[in-house]
């Protein structure tokens, strides 16, 4: 009866998750710089570059022109972006630290972005659009569709094909060591349904943190390439098919996964054999899985797979996360049409302390695909410090994560 009630509430648009997103405190590091004032650079670090499509005080009218003006060295730079809708593709290849700030009063007011019940119209003041999809393989690789790509060069960012993807040369350098974005939405709205890979962002051979950002597409929304490390905090990620996929390491904290429909799975990862014990995979912690709106909610009840293995070394884990009724009772699924479903002894598709009307522990355990972990089994993956590594496999590797985030002690130990 409780599950029926939750389904009816969602259909009426009245459902509300009880996950921690409602109590998120956004990153505070740049709140004075991001705040809307008559002097846009008031409170900003010295040397901050200002981008605006209309303000004559701005040095650049496009974001990419500001990025391209920076030297490819180890110096740190900050770019402040005025409110507006920007239609452009962004490409970051430099190694030095770079921060993109969306003008917003949210951080100053302490308002969460991932709490999707907070606003009637949920969006940041800075929107970046690039509508493109690799439908019928019209591009040589999925990376060409991305709104934002972070990586040292083209080869490093390619997805490729086959069980190991594109063979990135061993001598490829590492890209940006500390890339950060605050209060910006990345939207690839090529079609209102999954119509081929359509990246909102891609991160390869780089460390990237995203705070109070939105990522909107339908298929393959977020791509984390080889040796890519990405940390999402207080974000919204929207998609339908395999919308978290890749080879690297992605940790999503206190965020909302917005289910626009169901197809394939939410996660799809290709693990890699290394000489060290790696932690490549996708980890979703203290977050919520919700139908995107009241129209789709009753249509996708019990239909959304938590993920499917892109190869047999797939690793994904949902921790302390709320499931609405959209989630498939069995949890994960094998990859239909692939030998052995890409599922084997080294495949990790797991949950730990998840809850909500979409969580069915009996069905998940009976599936023989979804693993319900004990505390000891989950312990190696619970915090960012547990999973992020250098390319050589050394830990800790979290200096690039914003230190203003207030975590329970179990999440981030510096």
Could you tell me what each predicted segment is?
Residues 20-53, 58-414:
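Sequence-level preference for short, compositionally simple segments enriched
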Residues 1-21:
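Fungal secretory targeting signals
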């Amino acid at each position: 009866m409780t599950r029926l009630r939750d389904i009816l509430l969602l259909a009426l648009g009245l459902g509300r998750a009880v996950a921690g997103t409602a109590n998120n405190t956004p990153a505070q590091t740049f709140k004075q710089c991001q705040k809307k004032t008559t002097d846009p650079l008031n409170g900003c670090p010295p040397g901050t570059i200002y981008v605006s499509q209309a303000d004559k005080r701005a040095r650049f009218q496009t974001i990419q022109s500001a990025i391209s003006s920076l030297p490819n060295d180890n110096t740190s730079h900050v770019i402040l972006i005025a409110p507006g809708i920007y239609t452009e593709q962004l490409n970051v290849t430099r190694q030095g630290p770079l921060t993109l700030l969306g003008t917003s009063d949210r951080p100053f007011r302490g308002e969460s972005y991932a709490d999707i019940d907070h606003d009637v119209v949920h969006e940041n003041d800075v929107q970046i659009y690039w509508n493109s999809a690799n439908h019928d393989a019209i591009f040589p690789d999925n990376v060409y569709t991305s709104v934002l790509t972070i990586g040292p060069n083209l080869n490093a960012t390619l997805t490729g094909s086959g069980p190991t993807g594109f063979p990135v040369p061993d001598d490829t350098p590492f890209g940006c060591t500390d890339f950060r974005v605050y209060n910006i939405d990345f939207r690839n709205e090529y079609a209102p349904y999954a119509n081929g890979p359509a990246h909102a962002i891609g991160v390869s051979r780089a460390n990237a943190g995203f705070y109070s950002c939105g990522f909107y597409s339908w298929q393959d929304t977020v791509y984390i390439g080889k040796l890519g490390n990405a940390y999402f905090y207080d974000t919204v990620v929207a998609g339908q098919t395999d919308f978290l996929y890749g080879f690297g390491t992605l940790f999503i904290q206190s965020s909302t996964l917005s289910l626009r429909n169901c197809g394939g799975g939410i996660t799809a990862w290709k693990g890699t054999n290394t000489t060290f014990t790696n932690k490549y995979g996708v980890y979703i912690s203290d977050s919520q899985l919700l139908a995107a709106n009241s129209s789709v909610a009753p249509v996708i009840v019990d239909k959304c797979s938590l993920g499917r293995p892109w190869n047999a070394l797939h690793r994904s884990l949902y921790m302390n996360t709320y499931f609405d009724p959209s989630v498939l009772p069995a949890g994960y699924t094998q990859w239909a049409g692939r030998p052995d479903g890409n599922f084997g002894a080294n495949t990790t598709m797991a949950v730990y302390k998840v809850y909500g009307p979409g969580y069915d522990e009996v069905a998940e355990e009976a599936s023989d695909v979804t693993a319900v972990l004990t505390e000891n089994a989950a312990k190696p993956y619970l915090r960012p410090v547990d999973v992020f590594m250098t390319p050589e496999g050394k830990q800790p590797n979290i200096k690039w994560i914003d230190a203003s985030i207030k975590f329970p002690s179990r999440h981030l130990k510096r």
